[in-house]
Amino acid sequence: MALTICTRFTDEYQLFEELGKGAFSVVRRCVKISSGQEYAAKIINTKKLSARDHQKLEREARICRLLKHPNIVRLHDSISEEGFHYLVFDLVTGGELFEDIVAREYYSEADASHCIQQILESVHHCHVNGIVHRDLKPENLLLASKMKGAAVKLADFGLAIEVQGDQQAWFGFAGTPGYLSPEVLRKDPYGKPVDMWACGVILYILLVGYPPFWDEDQHRLYQQIKAGAYDFPSPEWDTVTPEAKDLINKMLTINPSKRITAAEAPKHPWICQRSTVASMMHRQETVECLKKFNARRKLKGAILTTLLVTRNFSAAKSLLNKKPDGVKVNNKTNLASSPKDTGPAPALEPQTTVIHNPVDRNKESTESANTTIEDEDLKARRFGNLSINSIWQPSVGRPQNSEPKQAPNSSVQTCQVINKARKQEIIKVTEQLIESINNGDFEAYAKICDPGLTSFEPEALGNLVEGHDFHRFYFENALSKGNKPVHTILLNPHVHLIGEDAACIAYIRLTQYMDGSGMPRTMQSEETRVWHRRDGKWLNIHFHRSGAPSVPIN
């Protein structure tokens, strides 16, 4: 699609309230003056984009303009002006499908069948037009309106690629970890079947409220997916019909050539004979699990969006977490003992999109998903919110070029060295904070902690504490610079980097001191601290401590 150049957007459209905001863009409601029709206009600040980014915008616009289906968010116009690019989409007001489900009074297998049918129809339309979405997940499944029975709309073609027929090729390691197919993880040629695998994951979640593949460790998560290691555990799956499980099995078939297609799946009895095959029983347990699943996704998204929008877009730092070809950042701090208890809790959350080097087929990534290996010519590039269909929530990044290029080893080594140095920096600032506590130096402590510091700690009896006043009391009444010597050891500190300007550290804290009778004592506590770098300075914004009080009270 040729972009319309030098057309005055404001001559044709009137802008209204803001709907959302990203790093380099803002989304506002607009009305076409000639027709009075409402749309959503994504306004991208092109002054911050490179020539290559402009090409990618044009490619994505071309893909979106090609797709005209009632279950796909449609791009109506693409207008380029000096310094800005305007993308005019359907105004989709119903929010996410998964959020709507948990608000319903009644939800059954038959409802899940109707949902997946619409998703499959949108995917089939993509495939017929030679488009592979590559990033099917709950965040990209929206509802046209808040009316009952509103159509499901597939959104965000930021990772979409164009293919010829049933072409299988290596288009790069791209997608969202929990929804990646085995062939992508094996670095094999792939094509349209990757979307059907993701549909299988989505259908699984629609039926029980948690994902089929989950693990707090990236490598183990990927091993599960490559092995197709999922099951239908009791008791929640006991009430799911065999036909529903059969469709999931056909979608989650490891061999892509034997996987059910987007044309075949709607003909499955569980979908085309829904009224007689799919169960009508209300699935309350699914709704409850889905609430936890949604809550975890939203919390992670809110934290990452804040970090991304406020980060320093320095070209010198861009090697750490460049995202022009990557997408949403991931952190590895959320753990869970069971997907049924708290929803998905792997190190790689299902909503976290990641892209790796498209040609390094033999190397299993040893970094967390927020590390993107890119081409030499991108080394000084900054990342931005370029996904032109991500209207309803800020996101960053774009798809990898389908033409594979080798990422130089020096880039990988440099990234590893910088990450290692930053982890040591987090350990050091944590030690400084602990030292200020041991010394009873509240002034030094306050300089290292954010004024809005939040915490869970034994002294607060399970309550969330905010600010410094709670801790000031202990500094002034239980601690002093003249106290007997206290020595603290941090055992096994583990640092997880969250973008360039945030990190989380977990460790065991051993505190040695002399009690009132002169006897040596040792206390142990387990701590997790979240750090955020602001104006070049690390500040502790949250901590969680269990075990004994942090400092002995004489």
From Swiss-Prot:
ATP binds at L19, G20, K21, G22, A23, F24, S25, V26, V27, K42. The lineage of its organism: Eukaryota, Metazoa, Chordata, Craniata, Vertebrata. It comes from Danio rerio (Zebrafish). First detected at 18 hpf. At 24 hpf, expressed in discrete anterior locations and along either side of the midline. At 48 hpf, expression is predominantly in the forebrain, and then accumulates in the forebrain, hindbrain, and retinal epithelium at 72 hpf. The modification Phosphothreonine is found at T286, T372. The keyword Transmembrane helix does not apply. GO terms for biological process: regulation of neuronal synaptic plasticity; regulation of protein localization to plasma membrane. Pfam families: CaMKII_AD, Pkinase. Its EC number is 2.7.11.17. This is Calcium/calmodulin-dependent protein kinase type II delta 2 chain. The keyword Cell inner membrane does not apply. CAMK2 is composed of four different chains: alpha, beta, gamma, and delta. The different isoforms assemble into homo- or heteromultimeric holoenzymes composed of 8 to 12 subunits. The modification Phosphoserine is found at S314, S318. The active site is at D135. Autophosphorylation of CAMK2 plays an important role in the regulation of the kinase activity. One of its GO terms (molecular function) is protein serine kinase activity. Residues 330-340 have a biased composition (Polar residues). Keywords: ATP-binding, Calmodulin-binding, Kinase, Nucleotide-binding, Phosphoprotein, Serine/threonine-protein kinase, Transferase. It catalyses: L-seryl-[protein] + ATP = O-phospho-L-seryl-[protein] + ADP + H(+); L-threonyl-[protein] + ATP = O-phospho-L-threonyl-[protein] + ADP + H(+).
